[in-house]
Structure formats: structure tokens, C-alpha cells
Amino acid sequence: MGTDDVARSEKIREGFQINWLILRDADTGKIIWQENKDFSCPDVEHEARVPIKILDLRAVSREINFSTVESMENFRLDQKVLFKGRIMEEWFFEMGWVSPNTTNTWQSTIEAAPESQMMPAKVLNGNVTIETSFFDGETLISKSVVRLYYT
């Protein structure tokens, strides 16, 4: 990354925050979990306590509400689901243009792995992390890690 990219990345990061996250059953729209926390902070490992029933859903609708001071040409995120540090799944989401000085809600649907590939919650509990990298085009804005606990 060049000097201009680093400066742009820092400028976007300073004015960027996650306001809240909601996970819903994609089929019924029922809220399964929500948290009013800035999960974009890169300096800590965040924790999320998610109801165990989320593992039984066919698909989950994720809503991210975020604010940005700076405009973004191509806001996107890459997510890696890791089990004990090894990648189990990887997803790529692209939102596109984001206007400056706005608050936005971004909804995405994530389909579950086939049941034959699912592990029991007691094995997953505390051993799964979701690593999310937020980008504007190819410029990394922030990378966060969330450890999952199933309740």
C-alpha cells in the first residue's frame, strides 16, 4: 500500500463505526441476536454470545448498521470463519458506493452449510472466530475478530 492509500485508510477508519448488528432467521424475519457495539475496532478480540438455535437455521439475514464520515467508492467486506485458527468458510460481500456523512444499513443473507458438514455446538463453542476485513476497493479500512459462544 502506498502512502496515499495508508493516509486514506486511516482517514476512513477514523470516521467509520459499526452502530449495531442484527441476525435474523432469513425465512421468518425473526430476530435471533442483536448487539449495539462497534465490532469494527481492530485492537481487541470481540465476543458474541449467539443463541444455539442459529445453527439450525437454513439461512441467516445479517444487518449491519454503520456510519461513515468519508465517502467510499466500493465498500466491501471479506469474512473468514475459522475453527481453532483454520479457515472453514470464506465469504465476500460488496455494497458499493457509500456517501459521506451517512448512516447506512446493509443487509446480506448467509446460507448454512449442508447439515452433513455441521459440527455440534459444544465443539464449536468458543473455538470459532469470524475475521472480518472492511475495504474500500482494495484499501483495507479495518480488520476485526469476533469469537463466538453459543448459548
UniProtKB/Swiss-Prot annotation:
Assembly mode: Interacts with Pde6.
Pfam families to which the protein is assigned, alphabetical: GMP_PDE_delta (PF05351)
Name of the protein: Probable cGMP 3',5'-cyclic phosphodiesterase subunit delta
A GO CC term assigned to this protein in UniProt: cytoplasm
InterPro entries: Ig_E-set, PDED_dom, PDED_dom_sf, Rhodop-sen_GMP-Pdiesterase_dsu
A biological process from GO: sensory perception of light stimulus
Location in or out of the cell: Nucleus; Cytoplasm
Chief localization: nucleus
Taxon lineage: Eukaryota, Metazoa, Ecdysozoa, Arthropoda, Hexapoda
Keyword ATP-binding listed: no
Lineage: superkingdom: Eukaryota
Keywords, alphabetical: cGMP, Cytoplasm, Nucleus
Similarity remark: Belongs to the PDE6D/unc-119 family.
Coiled-coil ranges from the UniProt annotation: none
PANTHER family, alphabetized: RETINAL ROD RHODOPSIN-SENSITIVE CGMP 3',5'-CYCLIC PHOSPHODIESTERASE DELTA-SUBUNIT (PTHR12976), RETINAL ROD RHODOPSIN-SENSITIVE CGMP 3',5'-CYCLIC PHOSPHODIESTERASE SUBUNIT DELTA (PTHR12976:SF0)
Ribonucleoprotein is among the record's keywords: no
